[in-house]
Amino acid sequence: MRRYLFAGFLPALASLSAPLCAAEGTTGAAAPTVGAASGAAAQLAQLVLGLGLVIGLIFLLAWLVRRVQQAGPRGNRLIRTLASQPLGPRDRLVLVQVGEEQILLGLTPGRITPLHVLKEPVHLPDGEPATPEFAQRLLELLNKDPKGKP
């Protein structure tokens, strides 16, 4: 409701200020006065200060988010994702290890379904992560040549 009230107030304010601006133009003042120049400088300084404050706040919040994400336990995790295989745009199979047990899960947008509990654990090579990081995928995409050079 307030937004609509404010939106109706702006055109009325603009219509009131138009005759005032026209009256100033008829006085014949060719050069701006010192007060107008200092007012413009003050407005510019306020604009730059506000913009700097908002940008600083964005950087501070980004730094805090990184610190909070790193604070979580990293070492001895009980639940780990071992492998993931996409089946479609939103469906995938995920192999999860919970303690000593490995479970194959089916993930859809609305459900997580346990499909199979493996009796013998699957051993994956240690050097390769289950899902590549974003940076690795980006490098792979950048190194691909779209023209198909041999």
UniProtKB/Swiss-Prot annotation:
Organism: Pseudomonas aeruginosa (strain ATCC 15692 / DSM 22644 / CIP 104116 / JCM 14847 / LMG 12228 / 1C / PRS 101 / PAO1)
Subcellular location: Cell membrane; Bacterial flagellum basal body
Membrane topology: Multi-pass membrane protein
An annotated GO cellular component: plasma membrane
Family designation: Belongs to the FliO/MopB family.
Disulphide bridges: none
Superkingdom classification of source: Bacteria
GO biological process annotation, one example: archaeal or bacterial-type flagellum-dependent cell motility
Alphabetized NCBIfam families for the sequence: FliO_TIGR
Protein name listed in UniProt: Flagellar protein FliO
Primary role: Involved in flagellar biosynthesis and adherence. May have a role in assisting the proper localization of the various flagellar components and in the localization and assembly of the adhesin on the bacterial surface.
First-listed, main subcellular location of the protein, grouped into a coarse class: membrane
Spans through the membrane: 5-25, 45-65
UniProtKB keywords: Bacterial flagellum, Cell membrane, Chemotaxis, Flagellar rotation, Membrane, Transmembrane, Transmembrane helix
